[in-house]
């Protein structure tokens, strides 16, 4: 018996060729009806008998090619209706919950056409199809149709329109479809904004500039990159000098996988990530014969590497025949530029020229950064290729919620029904441009999903801009402790929100429930409560933020409590004076400040903030053994310390003792400091390895004391590959179930998600 049904499909079904796929499937099966995009996903209506409908829905779910993904499918019977064929209908309006697809790297079919002299899109830098190209960064509103994207201003030529309307064509309903006759165009500008060249000549001009050591600002998918020849030491040094980025590693883009395999040691999973539709930056171990100059990632055994992911990048690198540095096109501490004129204004003193195009970018989206730990991808930055794909909540929210995230590595999130939409990485909220980007990201997500929050969730820290922004809105606000949010984000990913969990949240900073700076936390979370059961014994930040910039001050705050009030520069004698040029710089600072009466008085009188931060302990140890003099980017000292590890060198560790303090365990680091100062200070590999082993042993000790099977690991310290992998291995060996982030980063990029979860599933804090 015939019946008519409506199949409501939710998931990644817009911008992936879903409607053409459904059309072709219906044609193959001889079914009549229609399909369209809706603001919630897609709707398919067919009239057929029960078996045909069942076969159709099965094939729909099982044969949809990636990156399409059906997350929910509901079949509803309608009044019987007769159709004479199967059609694609115009999009319909309604509540906006459809998944927005991230931008996709260029597919192999488009690459073949790009370099085919007989193809009409030969060397066209904006070639795309239903399987690749811009999505999130061109979408202005839902549902996803050309008229609601920045491609609306480019009217398709006759040939493009024919492809767009031809059901069997790869560009059937490809919204960014274009060609050299009707689509976006390139131009090369000098520093004054004068057009020097256009179209292919602009590309040639950019390559010629890169070859002679110039820095070029290149407009890509989600914003501008600052690019230079990655094999030219002087060019890289010039970029660092102009961008005020003396030490932070730079990302490198390659034209093909063969070049990467020649100079790095990627495993199968890393290769899969590099070649995926998301095409993130992947951290790879160097080979000895690496052709890159050392100032790409000074002192670091790994480099952030990505493959060309747009046609423009492929064309550039094909002509350049070398890898190029591709770092975010911004000033230090600001968001990346997306507008041509804004880029000219802000990057004028960095770039020697500008390769621009006239396809507007709706919102800035940085490159994602991923590394492999314990055989799984671990995000360091979730942005292009992944955001803003929705994350299913463990249970629906009764109200529409807006989560503000933290202050560093900020992301924001909105929640409605059972879905959370986490923004792309927005950066540190330290400047007016990043505040503006933060506000625009909230406005953009709200517009896309027709979202008006009923309540706000924010970080507990009163000085955070995100906290203050929340307070200034005329809405109820719930403030959530930072490290609690870290652990909730991990728990939700693993579906253990109703279970008891030992949470270990280690990072650089977070406002504690007692008003001090936390960061080395052990949290016990049950179904109805959460409490701080252990923490690193607090130490002073001498000079507050100055201690973070100059971590020898942290070293002092560790040495004085360890060796006593009369400890001075002479106390460790030859140990501090190990003869090494760079270390002598650090030693001179240590020696000078060990005798600094003002700093000593700050410590003696307790006139400096206390912190239990594990991240700051890393800083102090790195300085103590002579690895770092001045911190110029977040995590620099910890990265330097991790780089010294030799994984198979030793299983030994330094002692850490646990003291009962006010019903909590305080982790006393003084025995560790004493033990380190008895080592040969030149053996930094040994000290770094034993230090990390000490932390793993600490986790196992407290886990065994608590006896909670599931142990969640969160916070920026768990970006450390050795620490995370060793902890996972040790926990499993000891009979525990380690939980660590998969969908979101361990750093503050996950805080907004944890905030949502704290509001949806309230727990009482036990002092």
Curated annotation (Swiss-Prot):
A zinc finger (C4-type) spans 107-132, 157-182. Its EC number is 6.2.-.-. It comes from the Bacteria. GO terms for molecular function: carboxyl- or carbamoyltransferase activity; double-stranded RNA binding; ligase activity; zinc ion binding. It holds the Pfam family Sua5_yciO_yrdC. The keyword Chloroplast does not apply. The keyword Cytoplasm does not apply. InterPro entries: Acylphosphatase-like_dom, Acylphosphatase-like_dom_sf, Acylphosphatase_CS, Carbamoyltrans_HypF-like, Carbamoyltransferase_HypF, DHBP_synth_RibB-like_a/b_dom, HypF_C, HypF_C_2. It catalyses: C-terminal L-cysteinyl-[HypE protein] + carbamoyl phosphate + ATP + H2O = C-terminal S-carboxamide-L-cysteinyl-[HypE protein] + AMP + phosphate + diphosphate + H(+). Keywords: Ligase, Metal-binding, Zinc, Zinc-finger. Involved in the maturation of [NiFe] hydrogenases. Along with HypE, it catalyzes the synthesis of the CN ligands of the active site iron of [NiFe]-hydrogenases. HypF functions as a carbamoyl transferase using carbamoylphosphate as a substrate and transferring the carboxamido moiety in an ATP-dependent reaction to the thiolate of the C-terminal cysteine of HypE yielding a protein-S-carboxamide. Belongs to the carbamoyltransferase HypF family. This is Carbamoyltransferase HypF. The gene is hypF.
């Amino acid at each position: 018996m015939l019946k008519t049904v409506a199949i409501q499909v939710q998931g990644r079904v817009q911008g992936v060729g879903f409607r053409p796929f459904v059309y072709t499937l219906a044609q193959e099966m001889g079914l009549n009806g229609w399909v369209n995009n809706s603001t919630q996903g897609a709707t398919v209506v067919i009239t057929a008998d029960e078996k045909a409908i069942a076969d159709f829905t099965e094939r729909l779910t099982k044969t949809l090619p990636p990156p399409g993904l059906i997350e929910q499918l509901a079949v509803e019977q309608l009044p019987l209706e007769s159709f004479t064929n199967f059609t694609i209908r115009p999009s319909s309006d309604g509540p906006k919950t459809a998944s927005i697809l991230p931008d996709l790297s260029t597919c192999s079919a488009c690459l073949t056409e790009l370099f085919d002299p007989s193809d009409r899109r030969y060397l066209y830098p904006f070639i795309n199809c239903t399987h690749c190209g811009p999505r999130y960064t061109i979408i202005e509103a839902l549902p996803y149709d050309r008229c609601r994207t920045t491609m609306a201003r480019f009217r398709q030529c006759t040939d493009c329109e024919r492809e767009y309307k031809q059901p069997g064509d790869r560009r059937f309903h490809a919204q960014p479809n274009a060609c050299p006759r009707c689509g976006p165009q390139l131009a090369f500008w000098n520093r004054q904004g004068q057009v020097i060249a256009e179209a292919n000549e602009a590309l040639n001009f950019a390559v010629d500039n890169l070859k002679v050591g110039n820095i070029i600002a290149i407009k890509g998918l989600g914003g501008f990159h600052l690019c230079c020849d990655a094999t030219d030491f002087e060019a890289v040094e010039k970029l660092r000098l102009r961008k005020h980025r003396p030490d932070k590693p730079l990302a490198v883009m390659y034209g093909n996988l063969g070049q990467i395999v020649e100079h790095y040691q990627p495993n199968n999973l890393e290769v899969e990530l590099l070649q995926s539709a998301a095409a993130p930056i992947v951290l790879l171990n160097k080979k000895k014969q690496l052709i890159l100059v050392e100032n790409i990632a000074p002192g670091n055994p790994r480099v952030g590497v990505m493959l060309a992911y747009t046609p423009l990048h492929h064309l550039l690198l094909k002509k350049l025949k070398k890898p190029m540095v591709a770092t975010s096109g911004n000033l230090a501490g600001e968001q990346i530029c997306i507008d041509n004129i804004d880029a000219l204004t802000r990057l004028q003193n960095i770039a020697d020229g500008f390769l621009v195009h006239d396809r507007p970018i709706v919102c800035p989206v940085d490159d994602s950064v991923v590394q492999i730990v314990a055989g799984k991808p671990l995000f360091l930055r979730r942005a292009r290729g992944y955001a803003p794909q929705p994350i299913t909540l463990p249970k629906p929210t009764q109200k529409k919620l807006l989560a503000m995230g933290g202050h560093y590595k900020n992301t924001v999130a909105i929640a409605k029904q059972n879905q959370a939409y986490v923004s792309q990485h927005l950066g540190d909220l330290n400047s007016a441009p990043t505040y503006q980007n933060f506000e625009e990201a909230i406005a953009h997500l709200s517009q896309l999903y027709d979202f008006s929050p009923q309540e706000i969730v924010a970080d507990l820290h009163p000085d955070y801009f995100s906290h203050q922004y929340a307070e200034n809105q005329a809405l109820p606000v719930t403030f959530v402790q930072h490290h609690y949010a870290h652990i909730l984000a991990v728990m939700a990913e693993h579906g253990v929100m109703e279970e008891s969990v030992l949470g270990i949240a280690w990072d650089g900073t977070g406002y504690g429930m007692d008003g001090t700076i936390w960061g080395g936390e052990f949290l016990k979370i049950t179904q109805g409560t959460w409490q701080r059961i252990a923490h690193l014994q607090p130490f002073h930040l001498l000079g507050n933020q100055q201690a973070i910039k100059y971590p020898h001050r942290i070293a002092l705050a560790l040495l004085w409590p360890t060796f006593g009030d009369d400890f001075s520069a002479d106390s460790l004698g030859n140990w501090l004076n190990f003869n090494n040029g760079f270390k002598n710089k650090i030693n001179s600072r240590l020696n000078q400040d060990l005798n600094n009466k003002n700093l000593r008085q700050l410590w003696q009188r307790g006139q400096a903030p206390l912190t239990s931060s594990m991240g700051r302990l890393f800083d102090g140890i790195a300085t103590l053994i002579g690895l770092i003099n001045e911190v110029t980017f977040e995590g620099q000292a910890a990265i330097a310390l991790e780089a010294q590890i030799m994984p198979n060198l030793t299983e030994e560790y330094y002692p850490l003792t646990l003291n009962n303090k006010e019903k909590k365990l305080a982790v006393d680091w003084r025995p560790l400091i004493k033990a380190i100062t008895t080592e040969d200070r030149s053996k930094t590999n040994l000290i770094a390895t034993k230090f990390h082993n000490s932390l793993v042993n600490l986790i196992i000790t407290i886990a065994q004391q608590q006896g909670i099977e599931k142990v969640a690991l969160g916070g920026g310290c768990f970006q450390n590959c050795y620490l995370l992998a060793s902890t996972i291995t040790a926990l499993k060996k000891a009979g525990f179930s380690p939980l660590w982030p998969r969908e979101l980063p361990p750093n503050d990029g996950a805080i907004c998600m944890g905030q949502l979860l704290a509001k949806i599933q309230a727990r009482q804090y036990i002092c």
